[in-house]
Amino acid sequence: MKKILLLGSGELGKEFVISAQRKGQHIIACDSYAGAPAMQVADECEVFDMLNGEELERIVKKHRPDIIVPEIEAIRTERLYDFEKEGIQVVPSARAVNYTMNRKAIRDLAAKELGLKTAKYYYAKSLEELKEAAEKIGFPCVVKPLMSSSGKGQSLVKSAAELEHAWEYGCNGSRGDIRELIIEEFIKFDSEITLLTVTQKNGPTLFCPPIGHVQKGGDYRESFQPAHIDPAHLKEAEDMAEKVTRALTGAGLWGVEFFLSHENGVYFSELSPRPHDTGMVTLAGTQNLNEFELHLRAVLGLPIPGIKQERIGASAVILSPIASQERPQYRGMEEVTGEEDTYLRIFGKPYTRVNRRMGVVLCYAPNGSDLDALRDKAKRIADKVEVY
C-alpha cells in the first residue's frame, strides 16, 4: 500500500481516489475548501492554501506520503522539486507539473526545442506590447494569461478596439501577480481532440482512442469518443504527444490537446499532466480501462495490458445557473435515470457558482453506432437536470 497525497480534490480527483481505493491505496485529499468531491471518498483530508509553499511543506512533513499527485494547477509547484529530491514520487514529475502550469515554458519547449507545429505566438508584458504583437499576428487572435486554468482570462480578440479589454481581462484571470500574456494566431481548425497519453515506468507509451471535444470560453462542455480523424493525422498527433511527454519525463496519464485542420494538418495546443476533463467520457465504458484507472496503474507501475475501444460514448456537462453557498439541489433525476444506456454523475460540490460544472451525463452505444446522435442524446439529457 502506498500513501498518496492528492493536491486538488475536484471531480477528477474523486474518480482517481475511487480507482486508488479499489487497489488498496491510502489517500489524503487536499483542497482550499472543505467537503470537496474527492474528500468525500478519501481516507483523510486537509484544507489549506496550496499556493502557500510553507503550508504545503507542513502538510507533506505531517503525512510523509510516498507519492504526490497534483490534480489542479493552483499549487506552489516549485516546491515539488524539493519533495522529489527528498525521495517522494511526484506525478508525473516535478518538471512536468512546473512546465505545464506555465504556458510560456510549455509553448517554448514544444515549438522551439521540440519543433512541434503550433500557432504563431508572442508574449506581452504591457498593453503596448500586446498591440504590437496583435499587429504582427493579425485578427482574430487569442489572448491568454501565462498561468490560468479552465479558460480563465482567455479571450478571442476580433479587432484592435478589443485589445485593452483583453489585456485587463487576461491579467485579472492570471494566477498570482503575473502580468504577462501570450497572444496566439487563431487557427481555423475543423476539430479539436484530446489524445490521452500514458507514459509508464516499465513499458511503452500508450494512446487512447482520440476524444473529440467542444469548448466554450476555454472550458469543456462536451466530449465524445472515438473522434473520427484521418489516420495520418492521428499518427502525427501520437508522435507529437510521445515527443513532448518524453521531454517532460515521468509516469502517468496526460491529456494532450490538438487542433486539426484538413488543409494544414495537426497543431499542438497544450497538455495537462493528469486525467483530463474531456476524458470523463471514458467513464461511459468506452475503453477497457478508464482514464483514472490508467493514471493509477501508471503511477504505481502496475501493468497495462493494452487499451481497447469497447463502445462509443458521449458526455455533456451539467452547469449551475446560480451562485449560492447553500448545498445545491437537483431536479430531473427521475427522468434522467430512466434513460437507457446512460449514466448520471453528480460531483457533490458543496456550493455553486454561475456556470460551475456540477455533474456530467454519460451516454454509450455499441461500436459502429451513430456518434452524432449519441452526442445529441447526451446534451438533451443533460439539459433536463436543473441545479437550484
Swiss-Prot record:
Q: Which InterPro entries match?
A: ATP-grasp, ATP-grasp_carboxylate-amine, ATP_grasp_subdomain_1, PreATP-grasp_dom_sf, PurT, PurT/PurK_preATP-grasp, PurT_C, Rudment_hybrid_motif
Q: Which Pfam families match?
A: ATP-grasp (PF02222), PurT_C (PF21244), RS_preATP-grasp-like (PF22660)
Gene Ontology CC terms, in alphabetical order: cytosol
Q: Which positions are annotated as binding Mg(2+)?
A: E257, E270
Question: Which UniProt keywords are given for this protein, alphabetically ordered?
Answer: ATP-binding, Ligase, Magnesium, Metal-binding, Nucleotide-binding, Purine biosynthesis
Q: What is its EC number?
A: 6.3.1.21
Pathway listed for it is: Purine metabolism; IMP biosynthesis via de novo pathway; N(2)-formyl-N(1)-(5-phospho-D-ribosyl)glycinamide from N(1)-(5-phospho-D-ribosyl)glycinamide (formate route): step 1/1
A molecular function (GO) held by this record is: ATP binding
Return the Gene3D superfamilies for the record: 3.40.50.20, ATP-grasp fold, A domain, ATP-grasp fold, B domain
Q: Which reaction does it catalyse?
A: N(1)-(5-phospho-beta-D-ribosyl)glycinamide + formate + ATP = N(2)-formyl-N(1)-(5-phospho-beta-D-ribosyl)glycinamide + ADP + phosphate + H(+)
Indicate the segments forming the ATP-grasp domain, all copies: 108-300
One of its GO biological process terms is: 'de novo' IMP biosynthetic process
Q: Where does N(1)-(5-phospho-beta-D-ribosyl)glycinamide bind?
A: E11, L12, E71, D277, K349, R356, R357
* Positions with a binding annotation for ATP: R103, K144, S149, S150, G151, K152, G153, Q154, E184, E185, F186, I187, E192
The superkingdom listed in its UniProt entry is Bacteria
Coiled coil start-end: none
Annotated HAMAP family: PurT (MF_01643)
Function in brief: Involved in the de novo purine biosynthesis. Catalyzes the transfer of formate to 5-phospho-ribosyl-glycinamide (GAR), producing 5-phospho-ribosyl-N-formylglycinamide (FGAR). Formate is provided by PurU via hydrolysis of 10-formyl-tetrahydrofolate.
Which family does the record claim for this protein? Belongs to the PurK/PurT family.
Oligomeric form and interacting partners: Homodimer.
- Please identify the protein, giving its name as recorded: Formate-dependent phosphoribosylglycinamide formyltransferase
Record gene name:
purT
